[in-house]
Structures are given as C-alpha cells and as structure tokens.
Amino acid sequence: MAGRNFLFVPGPTNVPDRVLRAMVVSMEDHRSPKFPALTNEMMPGLKKVFRTEHGTPFIFPSSGTGCWEAAVTNTLSPGDRVLAARFGQFSHLWIEMCTRLGLDVQIVDCEWGTGVPLQQYADILKADTGHKIKAVLACHNETATGVTSDIAGVREALDEAKHPALLFVD
C-alpha cells in the first residue's frame, strides 16, 4: 500500500484495503433465516465478554424496542407500577411503550440531556415502603441527547432503600 501509512489513532486514518472490501459485503438481516446460525457462533465469545461460565447471553433479532417489550411483558403485568425518568427520546419511547402495555408508569420528568435523577429515584424508592413499584427503568446511554446515566447509582438507591424492584437498563 504505497503512500498509505496506517496510524492507529482516533482518526482520521487510512483504512486497509481488506477492511474496505469487507465493508462492501451486504449485511445479514437480523430477521433472516441465516441469522440464528451466525449468532450461535458468537455465544462462547459473549460468555467471555460478560465474564460468565453459567449465564446464558440472549441475542434478540430485533431493534432495542423489541428487547424492551420482551423484558417488560415477560416480567411485569398490566397494572404494575414502574418508575421511569423522561430525559431524552429513548426514555420517552420506553415510557410510552410501558403505558401502552398497561403499566402504571410513575414518571419523573427531567430536563432532556440530564440523565437519571438519582436523588429523586432514591427519595421515591425510600418513600415506597409498601413496595408498589415493581420495576425501575433507566436508560444508560440516552443516544438522542448523548447523556450517560449512573446505573451503579440507581442500583445503590434500590439497595439503600432495601427495595425489591427489578432494575431494567437500556
């Protein structure tokens, strides 16, 4: 590759020809019949990534909203209360989905781009002594606004309140 130096810096940088050729191959659709075979090959590697010998990684052939729906409908029932903060487009969409599925969504409206309001979550969870809240929702990385929420802080709020609610993280 005369005249092309490959520097491994954030960019911009030249891309090797073999990588460029690989980029022109069509992607396999995540709903195609071939997709399950591709994912089976990844399972041992995923166990390594997630540092588990006994856990089973799940790969959903859907968009992220399909994963939300699977998690919510398989663990909660219509009428169950969930705690959720609205601070960007994806947290807003998750709240809308939960509402359509018949959940009682306790919404904490925040300025978009601020992330999960830890102190408000902690206060609400401590006040919920009857444990009516069955799940707490948190968008880790709110793509639309570019904010990352402190998920460990949400877990800590649940633990400090000795609250049994499930923690759902997108």
What is the predicted function of each stretch?
Residues 7-9, 58-61, 84, 107-108, ...:
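General beta-strand structural signal in soluble alpha/beta enzymes
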Residues 23-70, 89, 93-99:
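Conserved N-terminal alpha-helix of the aminotransferase class I/II PLP-enzyme fold
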Residues 93-106, 111, 119-124:
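Active-site-proximal loop->helix
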Residues 1-33:
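N-terminal "arm"/small-domain region of PLP-dependent enzymes with the aminotransferase-like
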